[in-house]
């Protein structure tokens, strides 16, 4: 694959669009409450810009040129995806936008936090370290890792709306003295060389057009001797791009999750090593012999539910829960309380959910390929 040309950043343009689309909705509670504060014209622009990469482009007709067009606009694609999907994520999943492993008897949000703790533990993050969270979302993992380690964390994000929400949550939890958020493209960070004691990424660098490129940027800003840890989204090496069903699953995941270019485990490992890291540990945590699969909430599987408090999280993911959300979003669009495109975005998330479950069941996809590496002294 040819080197990817980086998109030119324009923070003023992005800030103006954020104000136009989201207004003051970053100050609202997450989920459906925040959807009521959107500007319809800006929402339509985001919908059109995002879905132009997917509409009328089925898996059976996919070409390398189609994928190259998505890679060329990786930053815009990701930014508009989260302009559209953030509130729906918070409604359905909470403020930590990632998957996790589950233990018997473990409530959903406890399992989510444990997954974050496990990465911090594997990396050896300690009190007082200066740590970078690459692709921080609305700051759920960063807040948890600050509380778990007492490190100082900087969250990097290319979406203004998510930064506003992350900043608000940090202030509300009294963590602003330990946690800050910076606007930027992780393919071309503005931090000086050797800035951070440790860097982590939780299911975020999958949005890169080229994993080697983002890993090299992380290597650059990491201090010598520092450690980088990542939970990466990858197709397993059982994935066959010439298999139409495999390709449909991958494309469904990419469509519903704002991904321009997902690759296989072997390519991810090569990218990690080529970036210069000394590989300390690599493992597909989805391959652990867990009794409860990582994708069970997406499957709407009550049989694996271990806490009554998880009922509503699981219920939202059932076929009838998704059906209710589909009809509710459509009705709210019709009466003008939600902007047009909300239902289409929610439907794309449902497609992704089905494909994530299929990818997990068929061992074609993992959202938790763990790689930990050190930058040589």
UniProtKB/Swiss-Prot annotation:
Subcellular location: Microsome; Mitochondrion
Pathway assigned to this chain's UniProt record: Steroid metabolism; ergosterol biosynthesis
Inducing stimuli: Expression is significantly suppressed in the presence of alpha-bisabolol.
Reactions listed under catalytic activity: lanosterol + S-adenosyl-L-methionine = eburicol + S-adenosyl-L-homocysteine + H(+)
Molecular function GO terms recorded: identical protein binding; sterol 24-C-methyltransferase activity
Protein function: Sterol 24-C-methyltransferase; part of the third module of ergosterol biosynthesis pathway that includes the late steps of the pathway. The third module or late pathway involves the ergosterol synthesis itself through consecutive reactions that mainly occur in the endoplasmic reticulum (ER) membrane. Firstly, the squalene synthase erg9 catalyzes the condensation of 2 farnesyl pyrophosphate moieties to form squalene, which is the precursor of all steroids.
Family: Belongs to the class I-like SAM-binding methyltransferase superfamily. Erg6/SMT family.
Protein name per the record: Sterol 24-C-methyltransferase erg6
Origin species: Aspergillus fumigatus (strain ATCC MYA-4609 / CBS 101355 / FGSC A1100 / Af293)
Gene that encodes it: erg6
